[in-house]
Amino acid sequence: GETVAIPANGYVMVFGNDFTSTSWYREPAVGTSVTLTPGLTDSDTSGFPMEEITAMVSGGPRLVENGAICTTLEPGFQEARFTSAVTSRTALGKLADGKLVIVSTGSASIQQLRELMLQLGCVEAVNLDGGGSTALAYQGKLIRSPGRELTTTLQIFTH
């Protein structure tokens, strides 16, 4: 690629292969103005205001939606590692009262994780990651060690 200076108040946008390999993706020319409308799903065309976002992570597939097991696998989550593999997994869920549920399991299929999150009372839940990146620490103690070094972690603190 070419070297390009980033102007003041400019941004660098990086698109992964999942995005650039789609049939509708067209690489924009350097300097092209773009408008981002962040949404939670492909069908969320109205988006939400970024000013209200303090932190955001991505994951998938969805496990529980509106208090029911979500059996639809979005594009990008149809490989065997999501459909049938049994492996270490990490999930986040939300209870009806807004409390957060964090789960780390040593061995589960996506279906087992869906059922577990529903049994725990989650009205919304998402799979974050699995395999070697599954880890969990609580109050400074490592409860589940990762299978490899991690470059990015989700950390939740109370104050």
Where are these regions (language model features)?
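Gly/Ser/Thr/Pro-rich low-complexity, intrinsically disordered segments
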Residues: 1-159
